[in-house]
Structures are given as C-alpha cells and as structure tokens.
Amino acid sequence: CAAKASPINLTGSEVQGLIDGADYYAKAVIPAGTYTGQKKDATTFGVKATVVTSNMVESDLVYLVVKAVFENFDDFRKQHPAFSSLKKEDMIADGLSAPLHEGAVRYYKEVGLM
C-alpha cells in the first residue's frame, strides 16, 4: 500500500472489553511492512472476516467456492497479510456473524472439519 500511514498499537482494558463483549472482535497484528515505512508490527484489534451468502444461493455453488478456497488455502493466505494467520479450524466456528450455509457444511463434513 502506498499510503503514508503509521498504524498505532491499540491495547488495554477498553480494547479487551470490546473483544470480550463480541465474538466477532479479535486481537490482531498488522505486520511490519504492510504500510510504506511501517517498521514494526502494530498490535490492535479488528473484526473477524466472514464470507457471507444468502440461503437462496445454490448449495452446490457455495460448496464449490468453499472447496476452492480450502483446497488452495496456502495460496489464499498469501493474498493479503491479514490472511496470513488464518487457520481452517477457526474459520468455521470462531466469531461467525451468520449461520453456516448448507453447501459449506457439506464440504466441512466431507473433509472432517465438522
């Protein structure tokens, strides 16, 4: 990113209170080098990312999208520094903002994640 920004550390009891109060918040680290001139990691918090769809989307399509991401997980994690610490097991249960789609559940069960 070419932006001239300096991420700041956001920690402390107020931040921990936010994290404890909502499953969709988590501690996060912005890796050094994410922004031009950023020499150190920045410890902060953020919203957990979730891919959300409608239950009106065909189950087979959702199944194929989830399968493509999970079967190419190492490449997926390289697409953005924020993805680098993702773990498959956490992605299907930790801080979900919507129920899992039946197509996703089918894939997770097929590969033994559920």
Task: Indicate where each model-derived feature is located.
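Segments of small-molecule ligand-sensing domains
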Residues: 42-114
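Pocket-lining segment of extracytoplasmic ligand-binding domains
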Residues: 1-51, 56-57
